[in-house]
Amino acid sequence: MTVSGTGKVTLTPDIAYVTIGVHTEGKDASQAVSENNSQTQAVIEALEKSDIASEDIQTTNFSIYPQQQFDDRGQPTGEITYIVNNSVYITVRDLESIGDVLNVAVEAGANQISGIQFDISDAEDALAEAQEMAVANAQAQAENLAQASNLVLGDIQNISTFGGATPYLKYDGIGGGAAVMEAASVPVSSGQMIISVEVSVIYEIR
């Protein structure tokens, strides 16, 4: 007999990843780069003062490219503007401070924030619990089927997992159990994460 079982464990995220960027423009490439460098350095220093460790700040993108300017009729003016982008990827280990961290970054010169991702720093215990629940769920189904069919359930012959055990977010929204940081900071909701495990179990029938 082959049955499947599912186990789910709901957790509150305790870590976040955010991409913070500085975008500058200028008619002179070196000037645009210099301005961007100054703003980016100010952002990094502000983040470090907000208890973001230096090892949790990583530059992920730096780009500079020319952009043609156009007039009201859509015709090129011959003027060139240089676009400079610099992005850093940060890890926030205190979710209660994430709103303040974003505020600090913006006040220091950041003008691009994207890709806020929440995660669980240590999900091993939750994964083990979800696996136990999945096996117990499969066991219960097998016992019910055996009883309904007047069969005797034997030993487990094989257990396999499928569907993965990747945590995924479940947004409950404000007031629905989600961690929300408001006050004077940017309001950010971490929601909840669900670790889901599915198993397939083969039983001997006697």
What is the predicted role of each segment?
Residues 1-108, 112-206:
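Short, charge-dense linear interaction motifs
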